[in-house]
C-alpha cells in the first residue's frame, strides 16, 4: 500500500517547509461521518480565527491603556493554540472517524474537553490572561469605549466557540456511545498496539467504508425473500 503524501497545511512553495499531515475528507472519511468531521475542522478554523481576532482586540486594549501583558499573551496563544489544537484534538477525531478507533475517540474526548474548558475561560475573559472575554471587555468600557468595542468582537467569537464546542462534544460522544464504543475497547487497542498499526488501521478503514456501502447483513448463502435489490 503506497503511503499517501502529506498535504496539510498547504504551505506556499517559497516556505522551506513541507506539509506534516495527510488530510482528504472525501477519500479517508466514510460518508456517514464526513459532515461531522468537516464541521469539527470548521470549528478548529473558527477557533484559530478567533485567536487572531483576539490579538487585534488585545492590541486595541493595549492602545487604550490596558497594558502590554495581554497583547504579549495573545501573541503566545495564537502561536501555541493554533497548531496544538489541530494536533491534540482535531487529528485524533479525524483518525477516529477514519479508522473507527476507540483509542483515538478517547484521545479526542480528553483533549477536546480541555479545549472546551479553555474556551469557557476565554469567553469569561479574566483580565491579565491575554483574552478579550466578557469581564475584561465590559470592565474596559469605562476606560475606553472605542477599544472596548473592538474587544467585543473576539468576546462574541470566544462565546460562539465555547457553545459550538459543547455541542460538538455532546454530538460525537452520543454517536460513539450509540455505536458501542467504550473505555475497555480503547484500552484493548492500547494494549495490542492496534491504534498505531497502519495495517490494522487500513483494515478498519476499509471495514468502516464497506459497512457504509453495504447496509444489509452479509451471509455465506443469501436466501431469496422474493424482493429485488434494484432501487
From Swiss-Prot:
GO CC terms of this entry: Golgi membrane; plasma membrane; recycling endosome membrane; synaptic vesicle membrane
Subcellular location: Cell membrane; Golgi apparatus membrane; Golgi apparatus, trans-Golgi network membrane; Recycling endosome membrane
Record topological domains on the Cytoplasmic side: 1-39, 89-102, 170-231
Transmembrane segments annotated in the record for this chain: 40-60, 68-88, 103-125, 149-169
Alphabetic keyword roster: Cell membrane, Cytoplasmic vesicle, Endosome, Exocytosis, Golgi apparatus, Membrane, Protein transport, Synapse, Transmembrane, Transmembrane helix, Transport
InterPro entries assigned: SCAMP
KW Transferase (keyword) present: no
BP GO terms, sorted: exocytosis; positive regulation of calcium ion-dependent exocytosis; positive regulation of cytokine production; protein transport
Membrane association type: Multi-pass membrane protein
Extracellular topological domain: 61-67, 126-148
Keyword Transmembrane applies: yes
Function: Required for the calcium-dependent exocytosis of signal sequence-containing cytokines. Probably acts in cooperation with the SNARE machinery.
Family per record: Belongs to the SCAMP family. SCAMP5 subfamily.
PANTHER family for this protein: SECRETORY CARRIER-ASSOCIATED MEMBRANE PROTEIN 5, SECRETORY CARRIER-ASSOCIATED MEMBRANE PROTEIN SCAMP
Protein name stated in the entry: Secretory carrier-associated membrane protein 5
Organism: Xenopus tropicalis
Gene giving rise to this polypeptide: scamp5
